[in-house]
Amino acid sequence: MDVNGPKRWEPHRSLDLNPRSTPVYKSPLQEPCGVFGNKGTTKMSGVVIDMGTGICKMGFAGQTRPTYIVRNIVGCQPKRRTTMEQPKMEMFIGEAAHARPELTLMHPVRNGIVVDWEAAEFIWRHILENDLRLDTQDHPLLFTDPPFNPASNREKLVEVAFESLHSPAIYVASQSVLSVYANGRVNGLVVDTGHGVSYTVPVFQGYNLPSGIQRMDLAGHYLTKFLAEKILRSSFAVKKEDMDTMENIKQQYCYVALDFQKEQGRPDEKFRRCLKLPDGQMITVGKELFQCPELLFHPPDTSGPSSLGLPSMVEHSLSTVPQELRADMEQNVLLCGGSSLFTGFEGRFKTELLRRLGPEAHVVVVAQANRNLSVWIGGSILASLCAFQTRWVLREQYEEHGPDIVLRKCS
């Protein structure tokens, strides 16, 4: 793949907006345009940046998947001094940082929200300039925006994009709205469970319905820690290399039980299996493999604003939706995020949801195979549309109105 990406939308490249046979409402999304080219702007492809808690996804608008998927960490250490000058920091991102035990690691995002802007900017700049090899002055940037993101964070983002990255234009788009677009819809109830946070958001005609948003500070990272403590039988802090191993075990072997109590009641020996760790030692795992993702359905009381579990969160979100929209939402329940990829998740989720809503509910649960990329794909679709090109926040508008312009144009 050419790391520089296409400079213009190529007509033979297409995005599948309807990958499933599930009924889809006709979308107002128009044919892709793929260039940023209104008065006073450049004719270069936009870049979509989805900054999750665990992973940063980045690539060109109009592509079907991100060009770079990078672990969202920065590692630093002082450079060796050869003169009496002040020591400078040597910095790495992603796997390059994670593989160096001598580095001090920084995690720029916590529970979906950027908390370290210096580290976040370093990741963006590194991928844009060193990996994609582009001049940020020539490319508009579309950033994704999580639920409950403070307005001050959006303003800071605009400031970094214009003042530091020198982008000609930016846009900040709701993650849940982008997930709806990725599913070929403009209406839907998004159920997103990723690395740091889970939430449910009803979306109507491309806008969030704020009163229906439910959030739970329990997602993939919490599950990995739970699995580590269960398997290692320790309440002490787990080492970094242990967490890596547990993450791999979680992704390869954990599953969601269709009937948790029935599974729990089966003899322990039915579940025992021995796994060899990277250091050569053997460990035994068992019921932890389905107890781990069960927390998404029955979380502990310490999991943040909502301790309801995902199906109950959907029920609460639906209860806030105007009655005339409820059937539309029930028929467009969209699973998104990497922590929804467990084997058995989709079936159990739908069973639990139907049990709560009753037999009269006509629930349609949509679970695309690439749903861990839903937010980025939605951003790629949006930023490539001709009808969208007038919605970019331009540098001239920022210079005239200041960073609060994003609150007006990106609502």
Curated annotation (Swiss-Prot):
Say yes or no: keyword Cytoplasm present.
yes
Q: Where in the cell is it found?
A: Cytoplasmic vesicle, Secretory vesicle, Acrosome; Cytoplasm, Cytoskeleton, Perinuclear theca
Q: Where is the composition biased (Basic and acidic residues)?
A: 1-15
Q: Which domain of life is it from?
A: Eukaryota
Entry's Gene Ontology BP terms = acrosome assembly; fertilization; single fertilization
Main subcellular localisation: cytoplasm
Per UniProt, which keywords does this protein have?
Cytoplasm, Cytoplasmic vesicle, Cytoskeleton, Fertilization
Region span, Disordered = 1-23
Disulfide connectivity for this sequence is none
Please give the family membership noted in the entry: Belongs to the actin family.
Q: Subunit arrangement?
A: Interacts with ACTL7A.
Q: Indicate what this protein is called per its UniProt record.
A: Actin-like protein 9
Q: Which organism is it from?
A: Rattus norvegicus
